[in-house]
Amino acid sequence: MRLAVFGGSFDPPHNGHLALCLYARELLQVDRLVISASNNPLKDAPQAADRDRVKMAELLAETINRTGAFAEVSSWEANRGHPVYTIDLMEYLEEIYSTSDLTLLIGEDNFLNFRQWKSWEELIRRYSIIVFGRKADDGASDDSAISERLHDQSFRHIDLNLPLSSTEIRKRLASGDDCSAEIPSPIWQYIVENQLYQ
């Protein structure tokens, strides 16, 4: 089985995350996608509670699976109660799924600090890594920095051209903006019903 792993804060998940997952299903020839709501040691703590982020990740998986079972959510990271390193997650999933054919999917915002990750060289050695970019007018995509880090063949870069950011969405939600066009409908409904990010 070829497994793709997509970890993130998902605070909240948005249409860019959905597009990345659908791209993985249609074009990367992977059999299964595992979505993991994480606590990134290199970022500020998530605003939403772990249980809410896991639930929103589950709603993201349900949205993906409407057109065929493909995605599932691992709550292993969130249940640990502290930040977990990507190498630990990958090794855990290798054991659970009895496969070493894992592909790590990451957004370019995380990729820019990839060399700060624990055991980053081991990640390159053991796994395929695909970096998804989001071109943006606000400078969120730094082509020179991306190119510098993509000089070897350890990474594949795919530009989705979807300039969506959970950080910006949280700011807009806190201001009372309607972000329903940027967030999958079931997740938007969950945010509204649970009064998240107000």
Swiss-Prot record:
Name the enzyme's class: transferase
* Entry keyword Transferase: yes
Q: Which domain of life is it from?
A: Bacteria
Single Gene Ontology BP term? NAD biosynthetic process
Xref: Pfam families: CTP_transf_like (PF01467)
Give the molecular function GO annotations: ATP binding; nicotinate-nucleotide adenylyltransferase activity
- What is the purpose of this protein? Catalyzes the reversible adenylation of nicotinate mononucleotide (NaMN) to nicotinic acid adenine dinucleotide (NaAD).
Annotated HAMAP family: NaMN_adenylyltr
Write out the similarity annotation: Belongs to the NadD family.
Protein name in the entry: Probable nicotinate-nucleotide adenylyltransferase
Species this chain originates from: Chlorobium phaeobacteroides (strain BS1)
Q: What is the lineage of its organism?
A: Bacteria, Pseudomonadati, Chlorobiota, Chlorobiia, Chlorobiales
